[in-house]
From Swiss-Prot:
It is found in: Cytoplasm. The keyword Iron applies. Residues 429-480 form the Rubredoxin-like domain. The lineage of its organism: Bacteria, Pseudomonadati, Pseudomonadota, Gammaproteobacteria, Enterobacterales. This is Anaerobic nitric oxide reductase flavorubredoxin. FMN binds at residues 260-264, 342-369.
Length: 485
């Protein structure tokens, strides 16, 4: 069933109440999702995106009930992922010559999924426009790596609607389409979950891209996303949230997550949480067992936190697998502005804590004292854990706390020193890493494909240099963490 969005714009997407997994099984969609497709009927008839491939036949049937498919003048594909463009093969079988407008990378992605290089592709770039009649145009804005290289947004003049692709969306299914019609707590919870788990690696790109769009000085009366609600009531509120989340976001909270074999590590977590609360009752402390909790909720809480405590029993001299897996995800999400520490119990060798502490440094976190406990914690050991929590609360405080609590001295493990890595020639300075795709520029090697000779330090690399992997500019590069001084 089509739903009117504004004037001659209709939603012709698909709700998916049952979906519980996204990106394989990596993202739990506990509130379902929607695949938002939009039909514009001005002098020209335009379709923006399709739906997930599993709804292809249903989508084409429903669209055929709205219009004669042969009257469709243009198809706009903002993003080629299967939950956006999945119905293209079914649709194009009916109207094979219809022009498809997308980015250059979009053609590569669409062909990679659908294998139809003969389709009528038209490449668009930022600032390009398409006249759709009645004095209205579609203006295109490339948004590479938000969150795929092919991504773009489409703005419709006259109605002032921004078709924003994945940005500002959420995996959230509701019978209502607009943001002012749904539960606000649920909505913003899902917005933050979506940002933390999907867009955080690209936070460095969010603010400049938003500022670029705002720099066009175009009014935005509505933001039509690819998933979840359409923002019609104060649509810029979600833009403001994104600017906050992209700015090394943190709240006054600490997340503790762990896995345990005999509840010994859980006892340590509980005691440390008590100690934190004694010193600073204002801080929110959340504890999660990674074997029993939704990992995306844990990751969202880590994103929100000023600090994280990670615990594991030692098993075969390493950390437990679910903790290792979550730390690998955190490394990829590249959260910033976080403090961290490891803890855990052991029997005869406490290798898990040392490995966690090293992985926390790999995540880019500022690590502080780690804590080990042998066998099952007794009263004295739990007192040490509570004191450790108190020390953490003081060290990580966002604002000074007047409250002091005396307790037994703590026996703690100092964080392992980070190994120093140097370039082949120290005078060339550190290697530089792209914060988007993690490609590394080595001054000793240069980049011959862009005429950057071996032995060229980063300061002398031309300003128009682009990352060979993701085509982003110099501004997204940072010194390789192990070489930063």
């Amino acid at each position: 069933m089509a739903i009117q969005v504004k004037n001659n714009i209709q939603w012709v997407g698909q709700r998916d109440w049952e979906v519980r997994d996204f990106h394989g099984t990596e993202y739990k969609t506990l509130k379902g999702s929607s695949y938002n497709s939009y039909l514009i009927r001005e002098e020209k008839t335009v379709l923006i995106d399709t739906v997930d491939h599993k709804f292809s036949r249903e989508f084409v049937q429903n669209l055929s009930a709205e219009i004669d498919l042969k009257t469709l003048d243009y198809i706009i594909i903002n993003h080629a992922e299967e939950d956006h463009a999945g119905a293209l093969t079914e649709l194009m079988a009916q109207i094979p010559g219809t022009p498809i407008y997308c980015t250059e990378n979009g053609i590569d992605s669409i062909n990679g999924h659908h294998h139809h290089p003969e389709w009528n592709f038209h490449v668009v770039h930022t600032g390009d426009s398409l006249d759709i009649g009645n004095g209205k145009q579609l203006i295109f804005v490339e948004t590479p790596m938000l969150h795929w290289p092919d991504s773009m947004m489409t703005y419709m003049t006259g109605d002032a609607v921004l078709f924003s692709n994945d940005a500002f969306g959420q995996h959230y299914c509701d019978e209502h389409l607009f943001n002012d019609e749904v539960d606000q707590n649920e909505l913003f919870e899902q917005c933050q979950r979506y940002y933390a788990n999907i867009l955080t690696p690209f936070s460095r790109l969010v603010t400049p891209k938003i500022n670029e769009i705002l720099g066009f000085n175009l009014p935005v009366d509505m933001i039509a996303t690819s998933h979840g609600v359409v923002w019609r009531d104060n649509p810029t509120q979600i833009v403001q949230r994104y600017l906050e989340w992209a700015a090394d976001y943190q709240e006054d909270r600490i997340t503790i997550f762990y896995d345990t074999m005999s509840n010994n590590t859980r006892m340590m977590a509980d005691a440390m949480a008590q100690g934190i609360n004694e010193v600073d009752p204002r801080v929110a402390v959340k504890i999660f067992n990674v074997a029993r909790h939704d990992k995306n909720e844990i990751l969202t809480n880590v994103f929100r936190s000023k600090g994280v405590l990670v615990g594991s029993s030692t098993m075969n001299n390493v950390m437990m697998p679910k903790v290792a897996g979550l730390l690998e995800e955190i490394t990829g999400l590249r959260f910033h502005n976080k403090k961290a520490s490891a803890f855990g119990s052991y029997g005869w060798n406490g290798g898990a804590v040392d490995r966690i502490q090293t992985r926390l440094m790999d995540c880019g976190f500022e690590t502080t004292l780690a804590l080990k406990a042998k066998w099952r914690p007794d009263g004295d050991t739990l007192a040490v854990c509570r004191q450790h929590g108190r020390d953490i609360a003081r060290q990580w405080a966002l604002s000074p706390s007047a409250l002091t609590v005396s307790a037994p001295a703590v026996t703690a493990v100092q964080p392992a020193s980070e190994p120093e890595v140097s370039c082949a020639d120290a005078d060339l300075g550190p290697r530089m890493q792209c914060s988007v795709c993690l490609w590394i520029y080595d001054p000793a090697l240069g980049e011959p494909m862009q005429d950057v000779a071996p032995g060229t330090c980063w300061q002398e690399v031309p300003d128009d240099f682009l990352c060979p992997e993701c085509a982003m500019g110099k501004e997204v590069f940072d010194p390789l963490s192990s070489e930063a001084k």
